[in-house]
Amino acid sequence: MRKISSYILLWMLGCLNASAASYTFDINKGILFSWEYDDLVGVYTTKGTRIKHWALAASDDGKTSSFSSYGWSLVEDKKYYLYSPYNSSYFVNDIPITELPISFEGQMQMENNSLTHLAAYDYMMGEGNTVGSSADFTLNHLCSVLRIEFVSPKSATYTSIVLKTSNDVFCREATMNLETQSLSATSRENHVELGLANIAVDEGETLVAYMVVAPVDLSGRDVSLTIISDNGEETNLDVQARELKAGKLYLINTTNNEGKSLSSKHRASSLTEPYISTSDIPIDRDSELIVTGIRQSKHNKAQDDGAVYTLSGIRAKQSSANGIIIRNGKKSLTNRGRN
């Protein structure tokens, strides 16, 4: 049988997702993306038959790369569905494209200010129709990302961060439906947790962490963010919450405008929601979320239980601040192979 080499060119404009992607944060541009060698995406046909999972060979700058595969080529006038990050179990277990399972459990950040773990949880999908021998995909981000900046009041080693409210509104597990381009929760909890791999932070230094959450409307709810150290000490932040939207980056910090640590006498600007942009043009101002209080406590965990987290009311006004651009754009897939 003759091998067919199909080369698929993927043009990136700062998209967030890939299973082996590289991420960086820029205060003016948001989260910037770069492909890594041998990254994978998954592709299905209209009927849900897996065609091929393409291996990515990144270009020098990581923005323009080629997917290559053997034994197939795009079929004219056919619809294709693409998802990322790649999951081999979908094919092994013959899971329908309407019920692809995803999970928000097990998020673990290994180092301070590291974004590496985002690649496994920043779920995206898109669809495209072939015109001639090419197909264009616009991939949609399904989740929100929180950037948490916490000025440590003393030298400590941190083990986890928990975002919590009083009801089971946070998506724990869900399914992706590539045909409807939607996400549906299959189980919910009242919190979402980011594990920290014993990250040591000196007094006065900043712990920077990233957490992925499914879109959720927290408007009017009591919401807390709990930062836990290895000796059981907890710092509980009251957060004025609102709707967390897909494809948005939110910033939570515990410093005021003078850069001082948050205390009972200081309030912190936080949780800026930017709009997705495909250019470097500054975006309009948008409302922000406020950290309204901070409390120190110590919780002695039982050996086999989960932590108990403190809740308190929301007490702050909304204000506006400059947004942070997440650069995103269309992924253009062009079949350059021949039958």
Predicted region positions:
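C-terminal outer-membrane/trafficking sorting elements
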Residues: 288-339
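Extracellular Ig-like/FN3 beta-sandwich strand-entry sites
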Residues: 75-79, 218-222, 322
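Short helix-loop boundary/capping segments
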Residues: 132, 146-208
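Positively charged n-region of N-terminal signal peptides that target proteins for export
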Residues: 1-4
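Short, low-hydrophobicity acidic/polar segments
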Residues: 21-155, 206-209, 238, 245-248, ...
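Bacterial N-terminal signal peptides
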Residues: 7-15
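Surface-exposed loop/edge segments in extracytoplasmic proteins
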Residues: 47-55, 169-173, 232-238, 316
